[in-house]
Amino acid sequence: MTISLKVLAPNKNVYQGEAEEVILPSTTGQLGILPGHISLVTAIDIGVLRVRINSQWKSIALMGGFAEIESDEVIVLVNNAEIGSEINVQNAEQDLKEAKLAISKFSENEKNPEKIKALKEVSKAEARIQAAKN
């Protein structure tokens, strides 16, 4: 048995295919999905979606969104996403360095919108790096 998986971003169909297993980065932690899963809707965090196809894993960096799970179908609607094998690791590592540098300009307890934006950019860069290396 397999799961039908669709990963959709506003301007593109990121991924569509069959999977043996899907692991989603939900806002409450990792969510493993096998065929026959109960129906549910969940918020997706910035992180890595992992898909098992023919006993091999494929990674997709997700930038937040929602997922709808129905028995043997998963539809993921995200702000943006990148297939791990298409990510330039050097660019992602440079983005991570720049975001960490931006954070270092603020005090630890400071709640500045620019600091919050930089923290989000760190999460995005880390997800891209992790997806590219898996």
UniProtKB/Swiss-Prot annotation:
Protein task: Produces ATP from ADP in the presence of a proton gradient across the membrane.
Cellular component GO terms, alphabetical: plasma membrane-derived thylakoid membrane; proton-transporting ATP synthase complex
PANTHER family on file: ATP SYNTHASE DELTA/EPSILON CHAIN, ATP SYNTHASE EPSILON CHAIN, CHLOROPLASTIC
Subcellular locations according to the entry: Cellular thylakoid membrane
Organism superkingdom: Bacteria
Family recorded in the similarity comment: Belongs to the ATPase epsilon chain family.
Pfam family, one: ATP-synt_DE_N
Keyword Membrane: yes
NCBIfam families: ATP_synt_epsi (TIGR01216)
MF terms (GO), sorted A to Z: ATP binding; proton-transporting ATP synthase activity, rotational mechanism
Subunit and interaction comment: F-type ATPases have 2 components, CF(1) - the catalytic core - and CF(0) - the membrane proton channel. CF(1) has five subunits: alpha(3), beta(3), gamma(1), delta(1), epsilon(1). CF(0) has three main subunits: a, b and c.
Official protein name in the record: ATP synthase epsilon chain
Membrane topology: Peripheral membrane protein
